[in-house]
UniProtKB/Swiss-Prot annotation:
PANTHER family: ARGININE--TRNA LIGASE, CYTOPLASMIC, ARGINYL-TRNA SYNTHETASE. It is an enzyme of class 6 (ligase). It comes from Francisella tularensis subsp. mediasiatica (strain FSC147). InterPro entries: aa-tRNA-synth_I_CS (IPR001412), Arg-tRNA-ligase (IPR001278), Arg-tRNA-synth_N (IPR005148), Arg-tRNA-synth_N_sf (IPR036695), ArgRS_core (IPR035684), DALR_anticod-bd (IPR008909), Rossmann-like_a/b/a_fold (IPR014729), tRNAsynth_Ia_anticodon-bd (IPR009080). It catalyses: tRNA(Arg) + L-arginine + ATP = L-arginyl-tRNA(Arg) + AMP + diphosphate. GO terms for molecular function: arginine-tRNA ligase activity; ATP binding. It is found in: Cytoplasm. One of its GO terms (cellular component) is cytoplasm. It comes from the Bacteria. This is Arginine--tRNA ligase. The keyword Ligase applies.
């Protein structure tokens, strides 16, 4: 139950009764703790339509609200705010209801939808680096949130395995080892099962090949021709390319596993290749595509969005072509209600072109919503894209090692590597996901690793503190679900209990905002606020030495609720919580 929605529906009945438009009855969490828990600001915009002062409208609404079981206090403030304070029993009962529900008050979406999430997107032959974490972590959080809310999710890594960089690699290896059978057009036998290069060698070859092609137009033409021949199915090139893909996937899977990020599909641009001819024929048959200076293009029919080149002059395909073919494939195979791309905002124009063409040509069905979650860049303290101290790109494996080092330095007596791993992951993931994805942000691992402030380790420390209370009382193998039947939250005895209860029942609000806006930072902000509320409760509300048994059990119930809410929230952003720290 989203408490904001519940209160809005309660007020909407009064608005309707008084002849006011119900949509103005929206209730939101109060921006000022000193005036109430929630507020309704609808009287101000409503005044224009009702031809009455907003203060008079607000007072009229409050006079007609009859819900003493929900509201302890309803106050009107100039120019027309309605400040709402919940009844203590309603607040406690709602907290109990959430504690005893599987998803802490969150209800499944109805009807359930099928959502395809395209994220990760590493390129073949390139090791994953710090710049990849935004797509990986943001996409993983979104798939967790969508599944939690009841959607059927299909996640696809969508490898970059079919562009000009493949031709560059082929030509560079041919230059180094022309004797390899992959380059003999007359060879008809079986190709070797072992790759002629390792993934480490591939990572060294690509920069060299790229530099050569950028400095020599003839070398670039060779790479383009090799790419074209690969895409046309030249046997030796296909066999060599398959080695590139296999060893690259093995490497990036290890990187993703280290982040606890997993995919349902491991497809790439190449998997859409077999659909391109079918799709082009469809475009031609329906007069969507036309020739322009030797290339084949499709208009987007949108101002400011240029036509999309589908086939180049040389017959090769563009990234937009494979992206369209991927949409074609997904529509046929999966028939999704929504496809979400988690990709750098620098690709925004590209996706506007692809989405416009896909919708105009009916490549996707009318029910299918296309969305680009366009995230900002990861920058260092200098405001530039994050680099190592030596000025190079930091590989993901090195970043994780550094995070573990920070965790170990702060806990030198901790010998459990799994706990160090959990702290390191919380450091990286929370440090990234606390930011609104649309913004660039400064990646400061030293700051993210602090055990105080808005950090992952601070969240872990708080939950471990709450868990330790329960462990001292119930032992190591306690089960919150069964215990909650006998431990109930009661009306708050002080402001610390009240604020903790109030924070606990706002969990579904955070989840809904994260779900609807593809913004996991709402979950992070919620978890941080809950951690703060619990720590104040912990300091000011003793448990173990209480003589009042009913109060003691009520506070234990609040500890249970905190552990449950924090555990679910942390899991939604891919963070696991240790038992001890």
């Amino acid at each position: 139950m989203n408490i904001e929605n519940y209160l809005s529906e309660t007020l909407a009945k009064v608005f309707q009764k008084l002849g006011y438009v119900e949509s103005f009855a929206k209730v939101v969490t109060s921006t000022r703790e000193d005036v109430g828990h929630f507020q309704c600001n609808g009287a101000m915009p409503l005044a224009k339509f009702a031809k009455k002062p907003p203060l008079a409208i607000a007072e009229e609404i409050v006079e007609h609200i009859d819900a003493e079981d929900i509201f302890a206090k309803l106050e009107v403030a100039k120019p027309g705010f309605i400040n709402i304070t919940l009844a203590p029993k309603f607040l406690a009962d709602t907290t109990n209801r959430f504690l005893n529900s599987n998803k802490f008050g969150v209800q499944n979406n109805l009807p359930n939808r099928k959502v395809v999430l395209d994220f990760g997107g590493p390129n073949v032959a390139k090791p994953m680096h710090v710049g990849h974490i935004r797509s990986a972590l943001l996409g993983d959080a979104l798939q967790r949130i969508h599944r939690f809310c009841g959607d059927t999710v299909v996640s696809d890594v969508h490898l970059g395995d079919w562009g000009t960089q493949m031709g560059m690699l082929i030509e560079e290896i041919k230059l180094q080892s022309p004797q390899l059978v992959y380059f003999d057009e007359n060879y008809t036998g079986e190709y070797p099962t072992e790759s002629p290069v390792t993934v480490q060698e591939l990572a060294e070859i690509y920069p060299r090949a790229s530099k050569r092609c950028k400095s020599d137009i003839n070398e670039m033409e060779k790479a383009r021709l090799a790419t074209f021949e690969l895409q046309q199915g030249r046997r030796g090139y296909v066999a060599l390319w398959q080695h590139f893909v296999r060893i690259s996937i093995d490497a990036v899977k290890k990187d993703f596993d280290s982040l606890d990020v997993h995919f349902d599909l491991w497809l790439g641009e190449s998997d859409a290749n077999k659909f391109i001819d079918e799709m082009i024929s469809y475009f031609q048959a329906n007069n969507f595509i036309y020739e322009d200076e030797g290339a084949w293009v499709i208009d987007t029919n949108k101002d400011g969005v240029p036509p999309l080149i589908v086939i180049k002059k040389d017959g090769g395909v563009m990234y937009g072509t494979t992206d369209l073919a991927t949409l074609w494939q997904r529509s046929k195979d999966l028939d999704p209600d929504e496809i979400i791309y988690v990709v750098d905002k620098r690709q925004s124009l590209h996706f506007k072109q692809v989405f416009s063409v896909a919708e105009r040509t009916k490549v996707v069905s009318e029910k299918c919503k296309l969305k680009h979650v366009a995230f900002g860049t990861v920058n260092g303290k200098d405001g530039r894209p994050f680099k190592t101290r030596e000025g190079g790109v930091m590989h993901l494996a090195d970043l994780i090692s550094q995070a573990k080092e920070y965790a170990k330095n702060r806990m030198p007596d901790e010998n459990d590597d799994s706990i160090i791993d959990q702290i390191a992951m919380a450091t990286i993931k929370f440090g990234d996901l606390i930011n609104n994805y649309a913004n660039d942000y400064f990646f400061d691992l030293e700051k993210f690793a602090q055990h105080e402030g808005k950090t992952g380790p601070y969240l872990l420390y708080t939950v471990v503190r709450a868990k330790s209370i329960l462990r001292k009382i119930f032992g190591d193998n306690y089960d919150i679900k069964s215990l909650a039947k006998d431990y109930k939250v009661v009306n708050a005895h002080n402001e610390y209990e009240e604020k903790l209860q109030l924070q606990l029942i706002q969990f579904p609000i955070a989840v809904q905002r994260a779900y609807e806006n593809s913004q996991p930072h709402h979950i992070c902000e919620y978890a941080y606020s809950l951690a703060n509320s619990f720590n104040k409760f912990y300091v000011n509300c003793p448990i173990n030495n209480l003589d009042d048994e009913s109060l003691k059990k009520a506070r234990i119930a609040l500890c249970m609720a905190t552990v449950k809410a924090m555990t679910i929230a942390s899991d939604l952003i891919g963070i696991s919580i240790p038992e001890r720290m």
